[in-house]
């Protein structure tokens, strides 16, 4: 296993939106920063699961595509140098006798004066389609993630699911795909009422209450066989792509073994965003405190608090309250 013996000021676990803003703010406080991300790219769930979706509750943006928000955060972060480690899952964090944190991933050992974890809901994976031959079509035309709407242009697309993601993808693909069908096991969708209203007003083929029964096709799925719930009807759809939106399962995984105070799968923090371990901070959906609201906007506020207090932890002479950003950048 490789070992990076450099001791960084701040190591951030998680490269989602809150992690990226944390890295930028660490640069503003003149800290050396490292980001460790388990996925192959930065952006967290926004990039991996919802890159084409619009976000409406980020201050200053009437609406912004998820991937555009990530791109903006990466551009903002690029004002400073960071070390970025992708496809590395942190397996253990240990505070050594000298106060330096030792972080061990599946690839490398890292060292840091402080740690800020911004890992969202922890590791996540999609709920798989439980049909006998489903796995053989993964990576072909069975999709659990949609990273580019245009690859479905002119194609016949079936979507399984009844939540917000399924309905949103159906509505966004309607003007792009040749044909879109959405299949849900219940007549009533779980998605937001306004989205469901738009769905029924659209040209999307809504099939309820049906469940997938069989996938037919040699190299790729060519037909999707549906069975009516508590009924005898069957439907066979000719399709080019199948998108499964059955939600995702998240887990804190090894984080539970790091000696942190955990409450309902969240890390308990003080008003400084520090955990029960001195020098170990948390921000974003991974942490909890009285009155906590899980929003990206909330995480963007928690990130500077974590960084400024991490700076004061490393250097007691440093001010927790930073200078205004205008004074920091006006000569740059």
UniProtKB/Swiss-Prot annotation:
A GO BP annotation: cell redox homeostasis
Question: Which residues of this UniProt protein bind FAD?
Answer: 37, 45, 50, 90, 124, 285, 326
- Which controlled-vocabulary keywords does the entry list? FAD, Flavoprotein, NADP, Oxidoreductase
Explain how, and how many, cofactor molecules are bound.
Binds 1 FAD per subunit.
Family label:
Belongs to the ferredoxin--NADP reductase type 2 family.
**Record's subunit section:** Homodimer.
This protein is called what?
A: Ferredoxin--NADP reductase 2
Q: Which organism is it from?
A: Bacillus subtilis (strain 168)
